[in-house]
């Protein structure tokens, strides 16, 4: 008996994902290569031709992107710090994160979005700091303008975020645009959501000029907010990520569950449910939670009950040096004493079979 047509389409994205042998963004590995731009461009594996051309033509932009990798990976680890999967990186892995992102999960959606956002942020900042020859401050922010407070003059250095977005789109999306599979479309969608997130927090800053601090004349400029705001925003999008399936002509998505809203360009999308990340699983790329510190009094994701997946925890009595008895001394220093603090540290027990498993 033949399966209903609707059932075939529900399975199609998973089939396409299984047939896709490699979905990692190898440019993430730029952080590990370092060195000169030529060394970096020639030694990052898996770059497509257009990425390698951009790499050679714009060494100053590549330096900014390379430095930015550390920033967005740190932000990813901050957002996932209390979760079983904590955005851990693998130094010798060309994909930076290992096999865990081969699954088209919520975690993959977040990493692609935060990495794309990180590229926009790094390039735009480098432009404003005069570190990139091909861009500078936003050339459109000149002359006078008007807002709710009245007329002001554009001055200072407005962040040229449009250049950052344009270059990030050309470089980051290049590999995905060569693919026609479901995972490539998912990555492109989440890359765009990440870029849009940075621009969302572009804010106008102003300085007043006048006698005795009066604001008879204002000079304003546009500046990116701290990257933490982008990370927090994408974290909320991660928690509200929408599971999708491919539409029938293979050009876009539709929601996997009719009760869910249709994803917007700002939403994160994913195909597959995440593993539980409880145990070390070579195939899934999960390191498990054995040895992870848990919070005995928490009721959240970092609680010992949740983090340790019901396996229990070990308690160690440790001492650490802390600052105590701090006092302010005029003017202008804070002086503290060094004190020993005793505390209990709780870590998740390993499963009875601690060897690598191939279970998914």
Curated annotation (Swiss-Prot):
Lipid attachment locations (O-palmitoleoyl serine): 212
Gene3D superfamilies cross-referenced by the UniProt entry: 3.30.2460.20
GO molecular function: cytokine activity; frizzled binding; receptor ligand activity
GO biological process: atrial cardiac muscle tissue morphogenesis; canonical Wnt signaling pathway; cardiac epithelial to mesenchymal transition; cardiac muscle cell proliferation; cell fate commitment; cell proliferation in midbrain; cell-cell signaling; cellular response to retinoic acid
Subcellular localization: Secreted, Extracellular space, Extracellular matrix; Secreted
Disulfide bonds: 76-87, 127-135, 137-157, 206-220, 208-215, 278-309, 294-304, 308-348, 324-339, 326-336, 331-332
Post-translational modification summary for this protein: Palmitoleoylation is required for efficient binding to frizzled receptors. Depalmitoleoylation leads to Wnt signaling pathway inhibition.
Glycosylation-annotated residues: 295
Family: Belongs to the Wnt family.
PANTHER family xrefs: PROTEIN WNT-2, WNT RELATED
Its biological purpose: Ligand for members of the frizzled family of seven transmembrane receptors. Functions in the canonical Wnt signaling pathway that results in activation of transcription factors of the TCF/LEF family. Functions as a upstream regulator of FGF10 expression. Plays an important role in embryonic lung development. May contribute to embryonic brain development by regulating the proliferation of dopaminergic precursors and neurons.
Stated name of the protein: Protein Wnt-2
Lineage of origin: Eukaryota, Metazoa, Chordata, Craniata, Vertebrata
